[in-house]
């Protein structure tokens, strides 16, 4: 079969570094009996070693040329191929018997919306291991008060404990991306550290708070909360959103929800 030409519209950069591949597979630690789903298998760099540890692997792939290659190499009872866009894929449909392990070298051009989509399945996965742009991983694991801290940070840390595992240089891929990459581990919280009364309200409030990063909470949340609300929670409305902890965002969300029910 002829060489596959990476397609820019699908954000294809194929992992080829044997050390990085081994490190990711070791971190996933797939065992027989696990239900593992690989997102964007590409040319099979992770697929092959994962199948050495598993009797069956699910993959989600949008590129029909790659699907044809994978189908020609692996029998369907071992590699279950789901053709489609990961952004619209129902991962919950594969978790009807047990939670999933998700892994993948995620397409960099859709990484942020894909992470938000995957976060909705937190209660149906045991862990996730992803290759992403280093700058996205920096945002995921950021602490309050730093420039990388934002909406993605808050909403993912609400659901997951996250750990950067390894940084990956551009030359580990073909073609090399223009950015550095990193591998992150995401483990859903067994119990939410700061549960919100309404998670949709929390998501909306956090998005509004970060709508203009350089403005204060008073400005960004005008119409949501007033100075009396901030005072009742002991939160200075002159603070900027990136200084707030996850707990403080949950307090603001719950306060806003209480006002709506009055």
From Swiss-Prot:
Any coiled-coil regions, as ranges: none
One Gene Ontology CC term in the entry = cytosol
Entry EC no(s): 2.1.1.182
Q: Which reaction does it catalyse?
A: adenosine(1518)/adenosine(1519) in 16S rRNA + 4 S-adenosyl-L-methionine = N(6)-dimethyladenosine(1518)/N(6)-dimethyladenosine(1519) in 16S rRNA + 4 S-adenosyl-L-homocysteine + 4 H(+)
Q: What does the entry list as the binding residues for S-adenosyl-L-methionine?
A: 13, 15, 40, 61, 85, 105
- Which superkingdom heads the taxonomic lineage of this protein's source? Bacteria
HAMAP family, alphabetically? 16SrRNA_methyltr_A
PANTHER family attached to this UniProt entry: DIMETHYLADENOSINE TRANSFERASE, DIMETHYLADENOSINE TRANSFERASE-RELATED
Q: What does this protein do?
A: Specifically dimethylates two adjacent adenosines (A1518 and A1519) in the loop of a conserved hairpin near the 3'-end of 16S rRNA in the 30S particle. May play a critical role in biogenesis of 30S subunits.
Name of the protein described by the UniProt record: Ribosomal RNA small subunit methyltransferase A
Q: List the source organism.
A: Laribacter hongkongensis (strain HLHK9)
Q: What gene makes this protein?
A: rsmA
